[in-house]
Amino acid sequence: LRSLGLKAGDHMAVLLENHPRFFEICFGAQRAGIIFTAISTRLKASETAYIIENCGARLLVTSKALASLADDIVPLTPAVQHRLMIDGTTLGHQAYETWMASQACTPIPDQTAGGDMLYSSGTTGHPKGVFIPPDSPDYDAPTSLMGICQTHFGFGPSSVYLSPAPLYHAAPMRFCMSAMRLGSTCVIMEHFDPERFLACVETHRVTHTQLVPTMFVRMLKLPAADRQLHDVSSLQFAIHAAAPCPIPIKEQIIDWWGPIVWEYYAGTEGMGMTLVRLSLI
């Protein structure tokens, strides 16, 4: 990133599906002091371009899977100076793999903390960028997300975290990055599928996961025989947020998985978090 002329405090945009390279890009930005904005892949070209221009991105990283959208936003994002594309390339985009192969493997001498600047959903107008200074709080502070993951959710080197949601959302991205900083293994689904989710839990002996209530509903709609096909006894924490969970749905999940369900309320702005677990009710 520094080789492209980006310096600490500059902005870049990440427009990717749940791709294996997603986090190497985010962690690279963090170590170089870059502020990165992950963007929903479900937006229209004009909506995507608005966020890219508004956040002041000098670099855009995308993938061949999103080539059509990436091509459409080129004329709408004149401030972008560099465009990298993973798994292939189109006109106006440099191949990410070729660019990476030319980079040095030694750490940069002046590593500076960067961070994310995510955008609101735009329900009251244009989406709004939420900038949180990278050093407030420190990543390992007890009140940081990483601190909460360690002290309340028990993340550690033996943990396996399953993330079934789009990584451009705040919770999936930030929880995965916190888990990896704590030495945990992260298993990331390309997209949520109820039966595939259960199979991943069994195959990878997943200990932690985070879902939204609609995912609970879809799993509960599976035939009982299909739900019992997979061993989910490794699960220790099932964390959910994003929307209130109907009481009957939560009760059915607890009957199935046991008293491991945690609910939290928080916001992209990082102003605080409220945690609720069954044993405290």
Predicted regions and their residues:
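Phosphate-binding glycine-rich loop
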Residues: 1-11
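Structural core segment of the AMP-binding/adenylate-forming
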Residues: 3-4, 27, 31-102, 107-110
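AMP-binding (ANL) adenylation modules
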Residues: 4, 17-20, 166
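A short helix-loop-beta submotif of the ANL/AMP-binding
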Residues: 11, 17-45, 53-59, 73, ...
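Conserved S/T- and glycine-rich ATP-binding loop of Class I adenylate-forming
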Residues: 12, 29, 60, 120-123, ...
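Conserved AMP-binding A3 loop
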Residues: 115-143
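Gly/Ser/Thr-rich phosphate-binding loop
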Residues: 116-118, 181, 206-211, 222-281
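Conserved AMP-binding/adenylation subdomain of ANL enzymes
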Residues: 138-160, 164, 168-208, 222
